[in-house]
From Swiss-Prot:
SUPFAM superfamilies: P-loop containing nucleoside triphosphate hydrolases (SSF52540). This is Adenylate kinase. The gene is adk. Keywords: ATP-binding, Cytoplasm, Kinase, Nucleotide biosynthesis, Nucleotide-binding, Transferase. Residues 126-132 are annotated as: LID. It is an enzyme of class 2 (transferase). It catalyses: AMP + ATP = 2 ADP. It comes from Prochlorococcus marinus (strain MIT 9215).
Amino acid sequence: MKRHLLFLGAPGAGKGTQAELLSQTNSYLHLSTGELLRKEIDMNTILGIQVKDIMNRGELVSDELVLKIVRQNLVKDNKGWILDGYPRNLSQANSLNEVLTEINQPLEVVFYLDIPEEVLIKRLLLRGRKDDTEKTIRTRVDIYKKTTEPLIQYFKDLSLLEYIDADRDLKTISSDIKQKMA
């Protein structure tokens, strides 16, 4: 069974949900970069202080700093890990591959949760978050297409990509993922 996994997909495709389910059933470490950054801030670590300062200025946390935090969590691995929503661009993917080679934990499979854009927008609007207006959702999807979609070809070229139809019920998607992990 594969133990080093990555979930890719547009905002609202179900990456976090599927990653969390899988991490619970397999005791894998679930690494979501947003949660990792918040944890560093909450723990008031040296990296957390840097991250908080950057975020307070309204700036984006650098790829280098995010990778440092991801790396320090990957080396804690004992059973397996799942990266959720990282990397977000080709530069991050190349840097991540270097780190994974260095720590001898190569990526084994990338699950791409594929979902039609209109279904995605409807799903996000139903979440009921204040910042989830149709306009902001479309903007986020456009940014995703420009920066993250090239990763699909990148991981396909590395023979790591598995397509998952994310326009189905939770159980069916989860079952499909488990089959492709074997």
